[in-house]
């Protein structure tokens, strides 16, 4: 079985959810997930934002606020696994909800992320219910769960909550060290250990607009996430025009896996 580091478009097209998760696990913290704000105008004319982050080194692409139709066509065009955010809240538009109807609309997604944008106040119980609904509606699809930031609150979630999310999902989202207030590296490492102990992967998230900071800051965040034990580095959609600054994608990619793997990913 290949590591995600070594996979190209032909490999991704043949993967099921279990193989994708194992490919990430085998890559030892060297997977880059880039989030794209779907409604945002493209940073560069003539190409989509998703194409830009893929060109600069994204292994996985995550669509936020996706209201499009041809998800299968987008996946084929990008040559990368594509996931979609859903939110367990009735206060967000229908195309963002973790509802059965919306999940069926995004059934072609390679993975589903149960999370919350800043305008949606969502707790762990709501997330657990949503994870169960995803499992029921889209059997076999990997499910990620957790918050990329405070979502209107403050501070980090506790080990107990992380363990519960990890037991229910395939990967848990945990704010990377240095992002949300209080996200000290030893604390994040303990949360990562709790998630791993329950069998889940960990996605360390940079979703506090720091994905649009200078490259050195992003490199520091990326390395802190890797030191804490994260399997995947997430770079959010609030850098520039609905994506991470492309040069920051490259900087983070080189930091966590070196030029060899970074350049290979860009070329595949």
Q: Which role does the model predict for each range below?
A:
Residues 171, 175-244, 255:
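Catalytic-face loop-and-helix region of soluble metabolic enzyme cores
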Residues 2-12, 36-159, 164-185:
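Active-site beta->alpha loop and helix N-cap motifs at the rims of alpha/beta catalytic domains
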Residues 49, 127-129, 187-188, 217-219, ...:
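Short, glycine/charged-enriched secondary-structure capping and boundary segments
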């Amino acid at each position: 079985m290949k590591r995600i580091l070594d996979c190209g478009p032909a490999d991704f097209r043949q993967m099921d959810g279990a193989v994708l998760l194992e490919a990430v696990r085998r890559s030892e913290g060297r997977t880059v997930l880039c989030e794209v704000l779907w409604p945002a105008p493209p940073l560069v004319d003539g190409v989509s934002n998703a194409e830009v982050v893929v060109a600069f080194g994204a292994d996985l692409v995550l669509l936020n606020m996706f209201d499009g139709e041809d998800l299968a066509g987008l996946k084929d065009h990008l040559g990368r696994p594509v996931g979609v955010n859903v939110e367990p809240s009735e206060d967000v538009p229908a195309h963002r909800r973790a509802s059965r109807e919306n999940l069926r609309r995004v059934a072609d997604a390679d993975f589903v992320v149960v999370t919350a944008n800043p305008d949606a106040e969502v707790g762990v119980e709501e997330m657990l219910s949503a994870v169960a609904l995803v499992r029921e509606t889209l059997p076999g699809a990997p499910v990620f769960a957790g918050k990329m930031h405070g979502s209107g609150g403050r501070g980090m979630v506790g080990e107990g909550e992380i363990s519960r999310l990890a037991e229910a999902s395939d990967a848990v989202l945990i704010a990377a060290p240095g992002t949300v207030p209080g996200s000290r590296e030893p604390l994040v490492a303990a949360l990562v250990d709790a998630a791993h102990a329950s069998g889940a992967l960990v996605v360390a998230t940079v979703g506090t607009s720091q994905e649009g900071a200078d490259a050195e800051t992003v490199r520091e965040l990326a390395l802190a996430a890797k030191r804490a034990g994260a399997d995947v580095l997430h770079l959010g959609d609030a850098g520039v025009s609905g994506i991470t600054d492309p040069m920051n994608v490259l900087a983070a990619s080189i930091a966590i896996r070196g030029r060899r793997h970074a350049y290979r990913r860009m070329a595949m």
